[in-house]
């Protein structure tokens, strides 16, 4: 759950590319 929350925030504030690759 923590990772998901962190990813969500990162995706919104940080580069979505990193999150997309990590999530995919």
UniProtKB/Swiss-Prot annotation:
Bias-annotated ranges (Polar residues): 1-18
Protein name per Swiss-Prot or TrEMBL: Lectin
Stated family: Belongs to the leguminous lectin family.
Bridged cysteine pairs (disulfide): none
GO MF entry, a single one: carbohydrate binding
Subunit structure: Homotetramer.
Keywords: Lectin
Region (Disordered) residue spans: 1-24
